A protein has these predicted regions:
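Catalytic core of pol beta-like nucleotidyltransferases
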Residues: 1-27, 35-41, 50-171
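Aromatic/basic-lined ligand-recognition segments
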Residues: 47
């Protein structure tokens, strides 16, 4: 049985493989504790940059699958969104359907929106959106010291993407 890091990375790799095929997805990056060698993680965080032509419903469904996979191990996952102007716009809504009276932390919750704009809970800084630690699609860009398991699990599956190493990497 893989440890929690590898388990999350494998689930994230499945998400990335499917999300990169969604029309309107411009970039996929890994952020958060998975980009560090921290052994005990609680979640996987991914940042997806989207154009106006994206179907957030498809990405929300993929995000719920990622969260469901993580919950098997009492872990979590967040799929964050940024627009092509480089601004954080929210994260996937955790609910499949929008219901009044359901506890939702979004500011402008609307059926079919699939975007949770709970900026009072979390907001990604523009600097993180502009230069996330690890971009995995459409090209690989690494800006941090790369944990070995990221290289083995995520980057090996993304080999089709061109690589840019912003920092020297010690294999």
């Amino acid at each position: 049985m893989p440890n929690d890091r590898v388990f999350l990375l494998e689930a994230l790799a499945r998400f990335i493989e499917q999300a990169r095929q969604v029309v309107g997805v411009r970039r996929i990056a890994v952020v958060g504790s998975l980009t560090t060698p921290k052994p005990d993680l609680k979640d996987a965080d991914v940042l997806v940059t989207v154009g106006e032509d994206v179907d957030l419903g498809v990405l929300a469904k993929l995000g719920r699958k990622l969260k469901g996979a993580a919950q098997i191990r009492n872990l979590g996952a967040d799929v964050f969104f940024a627009n092509t102007d480089g601004h954080y716009i929210g994260r996937t809504c955790g609910f499949r359907e929008c219901h009044p009276r359901v506890r939702c932390s979004g500011i402008s919750c609307q059926p079919g929106n699939w975007l949770c704009d709970d900026f009072h809970v979390i907001r990604l800084e523009d600097e993180l959106v502009a230069a996330p630690p690890i971009e995995v699609w459409p090209q690989i860009v690494v800006r941090v010291d790369l944990p070995l398991d990221i290289r083995e699990v995520l980057l090996m599956q993304s080999q089709r993407a061109p690589s840019i190493m912003a920092r020297p990497i010690i294999w």
